[in-house]
């Protein structure tokens, strides 16, 4: 039904509508703001899910292979950003990237890199990547927990046999862990892709007001 409506000039009242076929789509792709938004979304989709899942896998492997009593604590700490309201996450990172009071610029100025300090969210070349960093930080813990659950289902005897054969952590991860949980990785990647599309708009509104300098 939604697609059929898109082929008409129907308004919210739905009065006197008629078919215009692909005219709405032609208008949409002639809109420079739509094209810019589409490009930015595609950039985020190409970067955020891959980095998020990669970091989540590494953290999950480290925690699942450790014998630390604090494993539960680490899970909670890394998962915590995912339970915070996305608006709050955006506000927190807006302060991190703030041009005068931000942690990032304060650090750069503190170590003498004054030329690197800038208005991160006010610059079109960096605002998108600030949003990407925020998305990665917010979602990594969620996928880490999912991967830990999958890794904990792998028999410890397989790892013990690999240790006897002289395999190190990296070899174990690439030869044992990743192949055995590849189905879960596929699922989490699709979820990360969907999450990037759904959450990027909210973060861009909160952090930049819809674009650099609002």
Could you tell me what each predicted segment is?
Residues 1-214:
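A structural signal for multi-pass alpha-helical bundles of membrane permease subunits
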